[in-house]
Amino acid sequence: MSAAAVAADDSEHLVTVVVPALDEEQSISSCLDCVLGQTHQDLEILVLDGGSTDRTRAIVEDYARRDPRVRLLDNPRRTQPAALNTAWPEARGAYLIRIDAHATVPPTYVEQVVRHLATGDYGGVGGRKDAVGFTPTGRAIAAVLGSPFGVGNSSYHHATESALVDHIPFGAYPIDVVRELGGWDESTPVNEDFEFDYRVRQSGRVLLLDPGMAIAWEGRQTIRLLARQYRRYGRGKSKVVRKHPSSTAVRHLAAPAVVAAFALALAIAPWRPRWSLLLVAPYLGVLGLGSAIVAARLPSAEERRAVLPALAAMHLSWGVGFWEGLLGAEVVQRAR
């Protein structure tokens, strides 16, 4: 289909936007405002609330009273994949777009999604994920998340050109693809998006990353919260690796390898201190170099000081979480 024909058809496509939310009173209004302000106005917006104890529900209900395109649905199982699985059977749109409650997108985002998916060439499309920081540490974390030293070759964090990829953040899919694949796997409450994208690719379809569709995403603002987040990510990845071994890429094994090296170094340090140092020296060198390169782009000393601990927290927490998930699952499997 030509670009002109696709553009002419844009207004004919109802799009379902799914917004999982839990205690997001600080950000839900910004999220809904950006969706309602899209150039493509043929929308339904399903907000899936996982049992918020703050004002999230009241805020969404107010939006729903003012605009019938907004609907509030309950997500009693609370997780992200459960929210998506509650939403897609309700969806009336030809395309389903996930936008989390702590994210915002530019006004042409939905229009660009429709333009890409209406060609029929893609099983899904997504944009570059730009972390946003509100504190000096938060801005350092955002810089790390936008650097290959932090996220390796995960192009959706730092891509500048469109490309076919193995994973898209906050993905948008034809609803027929979602129905065919049966939605998201609720046994992987973390990393469920990667697992779904793997099945999309296994079905013979391709995924497009368009960095022009930038997603502003509120990153963690403290090292402690970042470490907790990446430990969960590591556990989630281990579940996907066990379920789909062929989905594993080299970048997924880098952090677990570093953690294994540190564990071995600690074990042999009393007897072989030099060998112990040799085991971890390569990582420490890369950590120092990467921190210096990322920090050089930041304006304040406070931001620059937070880069090294942010990088280390991401790598080591992810690796620890991966081993916890992998070895914990192995223990459970043997006990059965």
Where are the language model's segments positioned?
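Catalytic donor/gating beta->alpha subdomain of glycosyltransferases that bind UDP-sugars
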Residues: D185-T248
